[in-house]
Swiss-Prot record:
Residues annotated to bind heme: 434
Topology within the bilayer: Single-pass membrane protein
Main subcellular localisation: membrane
Protein name: Cytochrome P450 716A75
Reaction(s) catalysed by this chain's protein: beta-amyrin + reduced [NADPH--hemoprotein reductase] + O2 = erythrodiol + oxidized [NADPH--hemoprotein reductase] + H2O + H(+); erythrodiol + reduced [NADPH--hemoprotein reductase] + O2 = oleanolic aldehyde + oxidized [NADPH--hemoprotein reductase] + 2 H2O + H(+); oleanolic aldehyde + reduced [NADPH--hemoprotein reductase] + O2 = oleanolate + oxidized [NADPH--hemoprotein reductase] + H2O + 2 H(+)
CDD domains membership: CYP90-like
Protein species of origin: Maesa lanceolata (False assegai)
UniProt GO BP: sterol metabolic process
Top-level taxon in the UniProt lineage: Eukaryota
EC number: 1.14.14.-
């Protein structure tokens, strides 16, 4: 029966789905006037794959099989080019690979290209349809620096350490076996709830987390809103979270008016009290939508990084010992009950090198799409307006030209000035570089500190498969056996 189901599903995907999508999204597949008039232009080499869906399934399947870079490097080799064309996510796409391509794209943000997400994202976050993605990004980036500037970040360290201690006490201590990935998600989500919304009660955090996972799973799914599909579950989960966020926002407005809440205590208060250039304040629904988006970016990537740190430290005892030695020197310098501070974070140089090597080998952000704003030429190839460009982190992270022996775990790559510019891009680059990069660094290092001073561990599934959908995740969640230093 299972084989029959798979066969029927394959038939649907390969035949019926393309035809359905053609009727649902006809504008996505029509030939533009610009392209028709310039059909003799030198487009990049490549194939667009199956009608309508193109090579989307090959692209996604490479990740499902745990080898997302195969799609990228196979085509680089096939076309002997670091730029090639394909069809991804129902869009004609030029894939840009290598450090020079990264530099070109990041340097031309909002000039030749701008941020773009598949239509599934806009349907899950409806307020993003009211303005352009460029305008949305500019609004958010004007708000976020106040919360990610150095003095603000320094104030988060003690909060992060407190929550990390509570997290390990509740979910790790006195356990013989745990499954790592869901616990890492709980840790980073707890932090995001506290710092973005001042929510720290574990029960309130867990109420959101289960549905929040459904939101993340649907972001890059096929945008068909039918019962049972990941996209449908994602929309419903987002509606549930948004409804509860609006209730929290309404109460916050009352608390601010009565002096029970501070105007600067978190991002929620700031959004409520900060008008735009026209003197207008954001609506409650829009604030809920923005906070939902921040929660996606504020915890999913770090949770993946934390889980893979656990994975690699289990596999590499000598690396674990280096991290343990560094963190115990810091721990021994602290008084009873004294929390981590900025000076402690600055001493975690080897630990951060290890984290960076994890981010190189298993980047949470595999790459990103850009919308082409106007025709341009790159490396002699014509890229038409309206196409999408996809840049890939793997095209540099696992390229021996930039990282010799690219599959070897070597934290020393990040000693001194580190990798060459535009080769290490786990947080993107240019104006679109993740504004929460330093925030992520803090939550990862605080996690590592509290982890290694408590435990050693070993993997229960030595060769556990890694799947990418859309971020890398151990297929079984990374079950481990814990050995407590207090035991």
């Amino acid at each position: 029966m299972e084989l029959l189901f798979v066969s029927l599903l394959s038939l649907f995907l390969l035949i019926l789905l393309p035809l359905s999508l053609l009727f649902l999204f006809p504008s996505s597949f029509s030939t533009t006037t610009t392209e028709a008039n310039k059909n003799s232009a030198n487009l990049p080499p490549g194939l667009t794959g199956w009608p309508v869906v193109g090579e989307s399934f090959q692209f996604l399947a490479a990740g499902w099989r745990g080898n997302p870079e195969k799609f990228i490097f196979d085509r680089i080799a096939k076309y002997s080019s670091y730029v090639y064309k394909t069809n991804l996510m129902l869009e004609r796409t030029a894939v840009f690979c290598g450090a020079p391509a990264h530099k070109f794209l990041f340097s031309n943000e909002n000039k030749l290209v701008q941020s773009w997400w598949p239509s599934s994202v806009n349907k899950i976050f409806p307020s993003s349809n009211q303005t352009s993605s460029k305008e949305e990004a500019m609004k958010m980036r004007k708000m976020l620096p106040n919360f990610f500037k150095p003095e603000a970040l320094q104030g988060y360290i003690g909060i992060m350490d407190t929550i990390a201690q509570r997290h390990f006490a509740a979910d790790w201590d006195n356990k013989d076996y745990i499954v790592v990935f869901p616990l890492c998600k709980r840790y980073t989500f707890w932090l995001a709830c506290k710092i973005f919304m001042s929510i720290e009660d574990p029960k309130d955090v867990d109420r959101f987390l289960a549905r929040f996972n459904l939101v993340a799973e649907g972001l890059l799914s096929i945008p068909i809103d039918l019962p049972g599909t990941p996209f449908h579950h994602s929309i419903k989960a987002a509606e549930f979270i948004r409804e509860h966020l609006v209730a929290i926002i309404k109460q916050r407005k009352i608390d601010l008016a009565e002096g029970k809440a501070s105007p600067t205590q978190d991002i929620m208060s700031y959004m409520l009290l900060t008008p735009d250039e026209d003197g207008k304040f954001m609506k409650e629904y829009d604030i809920a939508d923005k906070i939902l988006g921040l929660l996606v970016g504020g915890h999913d990537t770090a949770s993946s990084a934390c889980a893979f740190i656990v994975k690699y430290l289990a596999e590499l005892p000598q690396v674990y010992q280096g991290v343990y030695k560094e963190q115990m020197e810091i721990a021994k310098s602290k008084g009873p009950g004294e929390l981590l501070n900025w000076d402690d974070i600055q001493k975690m140089k080897y630990s951060w090198n290890v984290a960076c090597e994890v981010l190189r080998l298993a980047p949470p952000l595999q790459g990103a799409f850009r919308d082409v704003l106007k025709d341009f030429m790159y490396e002699g190839f014509y890229i038409p307006k309206g196409w999408k460009v996809y840049w890939s982190a793997h095209s540099t992270h696992k390229n021996p030209e930039y990282f010799p022996e690219p599959y070897k775990f070597d934290p020393s790559r990040f000693d001194g000035s580190g990798p060459a510019p535009y080769t290490f891009v786990p947080f993107g680059g240019g104006p679109r570089m993740c504004p929460g990069k330093e925030y992520a660094r803090l939550e990862i290092l605080v996690f590592m500190h509290n982890l290694v001073k408590r435990f050693r561990w070993e993997k229960l599934i030595p060769d556990e498969k890694i799947v990418v959908n859309p971020m890398p995740v151990p297929e079984k969640g990374l079950p481990i056996r814990l050995f407590s230093y207090d035991a």
